[in-house]
Amino acid sequence: MINASLVAMEINNCLPAMEIPRETENYEGFYHLISMSGDVAEAHLNYIIRDHDASLFEAKKATLCHIEKIMNEKWGAGTVQLTITDQYRNMAEIIKKCMFLIENAVKACKNTNIPPLILPIRGGTDGCMLSYMGLPCPNLGTGGHAYHGPYEHITIE
């Protein structure tokens, strides 16, 4: 008998333990287990993958494909079924062509005596998708905290 919940745990344990949001920062990529469900017969793991570097992002997807292959060799063909859906790509390659947007924002901050603070955004945003649709939308002034968790919020002072 194959216990699907135990196979799911094994899959998660195959991922690099230090490449999770809690253990990474700034431009470091990660695997983020956002939901899981299961029992003896069937289990589901749902991850998001983030990386600012396109080649490292692709490598993370390849790692998941490799884990699927290993698990199916161990437990039998079709035991593990991986679906990868691209939902987010780093918008830097689009924004680099439109740096005047960032320059204008920095200038506006300086004109109002607000020191500009430029930090990486570590999650997917609507602006990313809009940027790839032809409307460059850099992330400006998110003000957010505790992303991807139950206490994610933005202060509206």
Positions of PLM-derived features:
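Metal-dependent amide/peptide-bond hydrolase catalytic core
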Residues: 2-157
